[in-house]
Regions:
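N-terminal targeting signals for export/organelle localization
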Residues: 1-46, 178
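Short gly/ser/thr-rich secondary-structure transition/capping motifs
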Residues: 25-27, 46-52, 121-124
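Short secondary-structure boundary/capping segments
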Residues: 32, 37, 56-59, 133-134
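A short beta-strand-turn-helix
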Residues: 43-66
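Short pre-active-site segment immediately N-terminal to redox-active cysteine/selenocysteine motifs
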Residues: 63-65, 69-73, 137
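Hydrophobic beta-strand anchors of alpha/beta hydrolase catalytic cores
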Residues: 66-67, 95, 141
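Structural microenvironment flanking redox-active thiols in thiol-disulfide oxidoreductases
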Residues: 78-115, 125-131
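Thiol/disulfide oxidoreductase modules built on the thioredoxin-like
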Residues: 112-117, 124-178
């Protein structure tokens, strides 16, 4: 009995190490959002940098749109930004931004330096809308269909590969639906 009592903490520790080691091998971007095929959570937020203007969830329905959650303090957001600029310039899709817990002056400087690909940017200063969306970190991008339903959630930055092989085919399919 004494020998087992001495080995029990070691066995528990090894079990926990194995459990967490397996978890580290999983790709968090493969986690499905509970919002898929459900309406985009309603929001009505001030437009970043534009006094008196509001950005609402209703603006994202009626056509297929992208909602990109980003922040000026987010390094991965800076990495994906050139791809978003390219999409906006080519008019591939209407792109809306959700500035997540950002400081207005830092956001303004970031957009001045890097360019603004967004049709409008909602200022989620408190992070409440991001919580409603289930955001776990920036950047995250949502494809919203004509009916205002979330059809896909991209966790992490959009690069050319993700655009060409995941997002663009889904958007083309959604735009073809009547």
């Amino acid at each position: 009995m004494n020998r087992f009592a001495l080995l029990l903490p070691l066995l528990l520790f090894l079990g926990l190490v194995a459990y967490f080691a397996v978890g580290l091998t999983r790709d968090p971007s493969l986690i499905q959002s509970v919002l898929i095929d459900k309406p985009l959570p309603a929001f009505d937020l001030p437009a970043a940098g534009v006094d008196g203007v509001r950005v609402t969830s209703a603006q994202l329905s009626g056509r297929v749109t992208l909602l990109n959650v980003f922040a000026s303090w987010c390094i991965a957001c800076k990495v994906e930004h050139p791809v978003l600029l390219k999409l906006a310039k080519a008019k591939k899709i209407e792109l809306y931004g959700l500035a997540w817990k950002d400081k207005p002056e830092e956001l303004k400087n970031w957009l001045s330096e890097l360019g603004n690909p967004y049709a409008a940017i909602a200022d989620d200063a408190t992070g409440r809308t991001a919580i409603d969306l289930g955001v776990t970190g920036a950047p995250e991008t949502y494809i919203i269909d004509r009916k205002g339903q979330v059809r896909y959630k991209q966790i992490g930055p959009i690069d050319d590969y993700v655009w060409e092989n995941t997002l663009q085919p889904l958007i083309a399919r959604l735009e073809a639906e009547q």
